[in-house]
């Protein structure tokens, strides 16, 4: 069984990740291992040495200073410590050839870590419908259409799924040096990026998997499992 490292952010007096991520890794045959966000340097490297894959979870906004921009008035709370830990963990995973799955913020962080940049606020950038369609602070499960590039990993993960859930006000503007956009919403927002051993999705498969097991495909890809996932994924 493969171990999957998940960076655990500070939450009050604890370090934690939402349980949905843990449950999805378990359902895909993996063993979730939490990596405290306070890990740095040699300790972080040692921790990544002991996992077989990396999961970058959703969360707050990435600090725009990471991609050379000033914060917009709509910026949510940032966590520089988490940004640093996850970027370094991602780069270590790249060096070791580990599979990496980024979800929402995690996909955005992958882009930033490889020289990309983000749309800081979709409505302010002219994606007016996204205020309602792409973000719902009540977590009521808003959905929108998504279309993947034929022959890509995103297409295989999305097979049979024409819609995904949505909870974000930021998105990838430029994917950086390694990642290629492979899925988009109807209004052109990047919904998936990928490269060898890398997959980033803008939606939240971990919250949808409890209702529709097809959303576990991204996690089966991460763990190398074969249940419901083509070998070529």
Role assignments for model-derived ranges:
Residues 106:
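NAD(P)H cofactor-binding loop motif with strongest signal on the N-terminal glycine-rich segment
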Residues 157-159:
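Alpha/beta hydrolase fold serine-hydrolase catalytic domain that processes acyl esters and thioesters
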Residues 164-170, 193:
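Short catalytic/ligand-gating loop segments at beta-alpha or beta-beta junctions
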